[in-house]
């Protein structure tokens, strides 16, 4: 095999050259992966003192979804199905303030993947929604306890995307805490202090 300088490459030079090309390719591929993925995922985790089946029901049924803090909800669990929710009790499902999440994938009682199909008209980060999606993982964590991991993906480094990421970091934390609260254990001291 010849080189650009016209001299024959030794076997060692050939291997080194190939390694250099591989390193360059790996670096370029790594850069592309970072550019394609953008910012780090937004991750929120928590535990709910309830079996996985119960926590799954909360996220995947119309009645259960009310436990997330929604005033109204309609869930159709299917690929391409929707989770429609409204957080204003005076609002109406289907109006401009309805949140519509499309179900992209699911594995019963293990994983649910959604994307925002329609953000509320008043949502300040509407322009940053495109290209984002969320994966929710449900894992047993001992007897009658579920570990929930919410991973928001598709964010980029733009100010609008980062503002939306912060919004969902706070909102997802609130939602998980809200879901978990009714299941918190009530020890005798806790009951005495709260009563």
Regions found by a protein language model. Give the residues of each.
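Amphipathic alpha-helical segments
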Residues: 49-68
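Hydrophobic/aromatic beta-strand elements that line small-molecule binding cavities or substrate pockets
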Residues: 44-46, 72, 98-105, 131-140
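Short beta-edge strand/loop motif at the mouth of beta-sheet-based domains
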Residues: 63-98
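A short, structured loop/turn motif at beta-sheet edges
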Residues: 49-53, 77, 104-112, 137-147
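Beta-strand/loop substructures that line and gate deep hydrophobic ligand-binding cavities in soluble
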Residues: 122-170
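Bacterial N-terminal signal peptides
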Residues: 23-35
């Amino acid at each position: 095999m010849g080189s650009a300088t016209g001299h024959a490459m030794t076997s060692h030079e050939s291997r080194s050259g190939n390694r250099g090309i591989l390193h360059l390719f790996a670096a370029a591929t790594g850069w592309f992966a970072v550019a394609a993925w953008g910012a780090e995922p937004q991750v929120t985790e928590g535990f709910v003192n309830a079996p996985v089946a119960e926590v799954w029901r909360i996220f995947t049924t119309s009645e259960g979804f009310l436990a997330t803090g929604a005033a109204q909800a309609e869930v159709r669990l299917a690929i391409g199905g929707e989770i429609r929710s409204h957080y204003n009790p005076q609002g109406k499902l289907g109006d401009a303030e309805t949140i519509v999440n499309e179900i992209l994938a699911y594995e019963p009682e293990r994983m649910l993947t959604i994307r925002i199909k329609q953000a509320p008209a008043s949502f300040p980060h509407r322009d940053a929604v495109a290209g984002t999606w969320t994966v929710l993982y449900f894992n047993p964590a001992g007897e009658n306890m579920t570990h929930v991991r919410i991973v928001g993906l598709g964010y980029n480094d733009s100010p609008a995307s980062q503002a939306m990421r912060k919004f969902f970091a706070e909102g997802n934390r609130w939602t998980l805490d809200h879901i978990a609260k009714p299941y918190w254990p009530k020890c005798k001291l806790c009951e005495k202090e709260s009563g």
